[in-house]
Amino acid sequence: RKLGYLDGCRKFGIKVAEEQKIDCFMSVGGGSEAAEQLMAQSELPEALFTTNDAIALGIMRKLQEKKVAVPEQISILSYGGNEWNEWVTPSLTTLRLPIEEMSSACVQLLNTMLTTGEWIPISRIFQLELEYRESCTKTEK
């Protein structure tokens, strides 16, 4: 996810400063700790992109505690598509993973491997769906 994000940024000429790449546990607590690191920097970025919804929730909670307004001061977008994304305040913008399609592809691949006895390396790209909600502002860029 991270590599795909950075590759996309390069393709569109978006520079991501090294200090803006924050690694954390993939949990609400990890997101809270990442928000602390982010706020220790001299300036907040215009937007954040997290590798899962739990991290985004932790960041949003910590920012709200510190009176940083989402999306007025910073927009947040995540990977995932958890059902609670529409119930948090502000509701979370996310790239929904096609879990059913991904699961089906895994089962089919496993079945083929068990049937043939062959290991089949595979690379597959799945289409994501943007669920635009309140955590992001639209820009004119």
Where are these regions (language model features)?
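Bacterial carbohydrate/catabolite-sensing allosteric modules
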Residues: 1-141
